[in-house]
Each structure stands twice: as C-alpha cells, then as structure tokens.
Amino acid sequence: MKDLCAIYTAAGVNYIDVAAEVSIVRAAKKGIEWAKKVFKNSPGLMISISDGDDIHFRKAKFDPLRCPPNCPRPCEKVCPTSAIDNSGIKENKCYGCGRCLNSCPLNLISDYEYNLSKDDLASTLQKIKPDAVEIHTDIDRIDSFKKVVNTLKNSEIKLKNISTSCGLNQKVQKSHEPEDLLKAIWERYEILNELKIPLIWQLDGRPMSGDLAPATGRNTVNLFEKIGSDLPPGLIQLAGGTNEKTHEFLNSKNLPDGIAFGSAARKIMQPL
C-alpha cells in the first residue's frame, strides 16, 4: 500500500481512495509523504464508506486447515495486496477485489460483507481525518444516506470534497433506468448541499467487477453520455471498469472531470 500510494503520488493523481481502516490509511500516508518530498505532488487522501450493503465492501476468507499441502496456492499469486499466506487472509490487507474467489481449484474461498457501523464511522473519521470521503450508495437507499451524511456533519471533520458513488443495476434482483439514477443523485444533492462542501459525482459503470478488459469502460461512458449534462453541480468522475482505454470511448467535446483507474493501475504495478 505504501509503495502504491507513493507511485500514484509521483504520477500526479488528484486523489487516492483507500479503505476506511486506520492501518491502511497509515501506510497510504507514508507513501504519499515520501513522494511529496521528491516529486512535489500532493494528492488528497479519500476514504470510502457505504450507507448499506455494497459489493465494494466485502472481504475474502477461507480456512487454511482445509488447504492441501501440495496446493500451488494460486490465490496468493493473484492477490494484489499480499493479504494471503499460510495462515489465511489478513483482514486488514484485503480490500475485496474478488480475484481470489475464482482462483481456488477447490472453491474454498468465499466472501463476506464488511462495513463500518455508525459508531465506528464517527470514531474512524476522527482518527483518520481524511481530505475527502466517498459515499457508496444505491438508488433505493435514501434514508441510510441521510444518516451517513449526518454522521459526517456531526464529526466536524473539515473535508475538501465529498464524492457520491452510484450506478445502475448494482443489485442483481432489481434493475433501474438512467432516469432513476439521475433522480437519486439529485435527491442526494439536496441532502449534501447544506454542508457547503464541493461535490464529486461518481458514475459507476461496472461496480467492482474485477474485469480488467480494455472495453469495460464502455458502460460508464454510456451512462455519462445519457445523464452527464443533467447532473447536479459538482465534478463528474467515471468509475467501474475504467482503465487506460476509457478515454478513447469519450467524445472530445464532452469530457468528464476525471476518471478513476484503481484496478487498472494496480494491474500495471502488480501484474497477475
């Protein structure tokens, strides 16, 4: 984590988004501070939180006692954070990318939901003091979104930005139209606007798919082209399957303010 954040800082990114865990943030800050001294770049540190069940907030697990002694351990090889060893999966290193789930030849690895409680969120904010927060939400979760925003407000942490991440069809059992997403984003704007903090709207095309193929950015580009011009005031960021090829699908006369590329960047630094 420290090395990755140092490299991202050297590359000149605007924000580095990490899990809302003290140990991870501590490592990220060390990497950022080292690179700042050398390259003079100074990205903001953003933490991700959620207002409910979210595929971005999962971790992997398995019982190491069930592993055969002669296993080639493909799970270790595909893990981008080196969270897996002979003792199992280190919870504080796993960020839920899901790569290991299909790597096990015996299907011993499963995932579970992991999220901060309301009380944990308040104390974590005080410990971490991030520059920005990204709230992962769902079209149908307006009440829980209000509660998270209220926690942010009461924390009195001085944030430079608040990002809201939402997309279509994040739940398999229920699909939505772009108009539904646009309505949901405007509802969240009305809630966030009173905080007087600059906003970022993240359009999630393929939420935490783990798919790194070049064309995976088409979904978020299509979503941006449909509703981008009608979004509330704030910066627009594309995410979910985005990578170094995503900009090729964009119209040069209609560009977003930014593109997230976490999985693609990790692939370059830590090839599978």
Task: Annotate each PLM feature.
Residues M1-A83:
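Ferredoxin-type iron-sulfur electron-transfer modules and their immediate structural context
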Residues L45, I89-K90, I236:
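Short, well-ordered strand-loop elements centered on a beta-strand within folded domains, enriched
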Residues P72-K90, R99-L116:
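Iron-sulfur cluster-binding cysteine motifs and their immediate structural context
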Residues M1-K2, N14, A20, G98, ...:
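Conserved mixed alpha/beta catalytic, RNA-binding, or beta-rich assembly cores of soluble enzyme
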Residues R73, N92, I200-Q202:
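A composition-driven signal for long, intrinsically disordered, charge-rich low-complexity tracts
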